[in-house]
Amino acid sequence: LQTYTADTITLDNDKIEFMADSTSVWAGMRLYDLYKQAYTPWEWHEELFRVAKEEGLICFSSPFDKTAVDFLESLDNPIYKIASFEITDIPLIEYAAKKMKPMVMSTGIATEEDIQLAVDTCRAAGNDDITLLKCTSSYPAPIEEANLCMIKDLAERYGVKSGLSDHTIGSVSAVVAVTQGATMIEKHFIIDRSIGGPDASFSMNEQEFAQMVKDIRMAEAAIGSVSYELTDKMKSGREFSRSLYVAEDMKAGEVITEQNVRSVRPGFGLHPKYLKDILGKKVNQDLEKGTRFAWEFVNS
């Protein structure tokens, strides 16, 4: 959720700097009017938290000022999410961090210094449970600007967990983010895009969201772990690897060549790496085509 009112996030003002960017989907709107249209009524929060709990979901919110933090504390809000445009609001970050709840911070418009200051502020407040979200603050965000390799770097550079706040259309970015180490995915949700709304164009409906979750779980399973140990299934598959076999009927004393002993499937014969060692030597017995080649067939 997002917990704000138009008055806690901006000023009721007609100056040009209080207008939405001309390149955004909200071009021409006053920020005050946009936020007045987009905000979630605070009186809805209690019921949303209650229903989420009944459904086994974790409900939490982004506060946009200290009054929102105080209000959310009354609902036992379990996590605080700092939006991209609030990452420079150090007093807000400090106030929320002191509640000693996990802190999630989006980095859409943040410089490296902004991020470091926000992380340091949390830690100075005694709160080290921090997740940084890679975010592209365009609505919708072009997928070629997702820059998902940042997810891994955020975790390593700042010593935190990392994830993705995704404003691209579709689920590709979210699935790829998991392969980059994302531990959290934020995606806008809408029941029906046809009803419209400030974020309708880049929100997912129920079916799309469910499919995204399935795809993410499959991606997590596909990542696996670094291991060169063969599973039982892989070991059985080695039966179909290459090995040395007698390719022509051979008589005792016949010289081994690349024509009469070859590296072929299946894998029950001598390892192919030994072919160069046996070429030019003689076999010590008659051998039938299709015989697994072994050291014991070579004259000593």
Model-based region annotation:
Residues 1-300:
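Catalytic cores and adjacent flexible loops of soluble metabolic enzymes
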